[in-house]
Amino acid sequence: MSDSGYELSFSLNTLNHLSEGLYSNILRFYLKLVANAWDADATEVSINIRQDEIVIQDNGIGMSIEDANTKFLRIGHQKREDSANTISGRHVMGRKGIGILAIFGIANIAEVYSCKDGVPHGFIIHKGDIERGISSDVTLYRPSSVPQEALSIESGTKIILREIKSSIGNAEKTLRTDLARRFTIINNNCNFSVIINNTPINDNDRDYLNKVQFLWYLGGESSKYANFFTKLKKSFEITNLGDGMSGMTVKGWIGTVYRPSDIPNEQPYHIYFAHGKMIQEDILIDITDAGLYRQYIIGEIEADFMDSDDEDDIITSNRQRIKQTDPRYLKLLEYVKIDIMRVIASTWTKLRKEYPSNPKKEEVNDSSLSKDSNSSEKENTNASSDSSTATENASSDSSTATENASSETNDGEVEDNSFFDDDIPEPSPPPKQEITTAFREMKNLVKNSNIPNQMKNIILYDIQQAAYAYKGTSFKACIVMLGAILEGVMLGTIQRTDVLEYLIALPQVPKPLSDLGPRNPKFADRTVLAQYIGTTFSFQDCKEIIELCVQGTNKLGVDILQTVRNSIHPGSVLKDMKQLARFNHQSAVGYIAKLHEIINLVILWNPPSIP
């Protein structure tokens, strides 16, 4: 190479910044170390969490000193350049060669011990030494070695972390679910187990086996999932792979839970996998539609072609999501949207009417946990990419979508308008205590959230007023009040008079309220407004208002924005709706799910015969 007079250099400070940015979250550290154990052909990796240290040990092939220097301690080592498969034939999970950053990101001291071919060795990394090297502009760091007489490891690799920077907290309880949901290789006939504090992770640690009501599995190879869930009511097979997916294998399942509250915010509940490891937590993040069903969605989609050795890395640098513009992702996204979600949207409402929606009301014996006792009925559903329906008879007749109260918008997205259909059957009404409990649960959800206190207090006040409206004012007032809360949560900044201005902007609102003008002091208190609405609006008006709220939040305000632009009082409402379109609060989904649940209970208790 000719001497051009230029050179590219790196500082240890780069290492420091990368570790803090990519692996400051302790969960990412665990994910990386479990993946490393898999790549080392381990059959077992143990994690022991103590108050002042974390110990991770596997029984893999181990590292030699040369391996440690050229692979483990080398930033940017490309694992798959050596081989895409391990000695035992496993596909390698690691790719970028930045695993060492996982250690630097969460601990100040790391002891690493390994033994390969009967030769043990060990070294100790001190974050403080690296930081001192940064101040001295040092470009090379040499960990201190462990004397041979102090080595006791006989096989595999052992890492001990001390001076943990992240709070361990209730680590064991949440870590089981975290790992169980982010790897498909654990306890899945892959000869690989993860043990936390001497107790192996099992399928129950996924914490949703008894929560899935309906299941759609992808191809015959995924039919095992029909026997996986303990309270499953019905399962369907989606056999069509979709246009443009030739040569690509997609496996897994999508299900719907009994209640939105069965899906906790802090855990991933619909995930993309490749080669047994999570590559993106949210399947629906780039799929927008107005269907209520999506609040109930849970699932796992396995697409190994998304992490092909022969193509560019599709995962972002933080290893948490897929690059949105990659053609492979766009094809998969289209398949999920057309051939999976439309199928679910067109059948879910009918299934919910046909089967009970509360598993707690059913008596389930311990024997029901066995695979053979599962009462699910299997049906094959051939998903058609040019049809938005898939009923029990696998009909592609477009009228089926209308019967199931799902309609297709101009842009091809499916709207689920069934939530407020007048033909809702009248099941045994839930006790009023159940509705009261739902309000109480929602209040607790808000109280325990991390939203600003001022906003939290306003939302809590509105929940209480909605409860009062239900008890003594008007069912219709309660519904509109809940819609106002729903809107307010998504706005992020709530002004009580904004709800009046918002209602004025909707063309469905009767003229008497429109004539009041914006921000009328008489209606500054939502209780008064709710009382007025309860005596002025028809039941259909209330349904349309709350339906627009639900539709608008799910579609990030796109439809509402258009409505507001054409309204007689756009003003600050347009500004607020733009805020809604940008709003991305991680807790909002949970609030909305609970609101849907409460509204559903209220509607069941007060059937649509109210004038």
From Swiss-Prot:
List its EC numbers. 3.1.21.4
Output the GO biological process annotations, alphabetical, semicolon-separated.
DNA restriction-modification system
Q: Where are the sequence repeats?
A: 382-392, 393-403, 404-409
Segments carrying the region annotation (2.5 X 11 AA tandem repeats) are 382-403
* GO molecular function, a single term: endonuclease activity
Entry keywords, A to Z: Endonuclease, Hydrolase, Nuclease, Repeat, Restriction system
Q: Where is the signal peptide?
A: none
Q: Where is the composition biased (Low complexity)?
A: 381-409
Region entry Disordered, spans: 355-434
Query: Known catalysed reaction(s)?
Result: Endonucleolytic cleavage of DNA to give specific double-stranded fragments with terminal 5'-phosphates
Q: Where is the composition biased (Basic and acidic residues)?
A: 355-364
Which regions are flagged for Acidic residues bias?
Answer: 410-425
What task does this protein carry out? No restriction activity was detected upon overexpressing this protein in E.coli.
This chain belongs to the protein called Putative type II restriction enzyme HgiDII
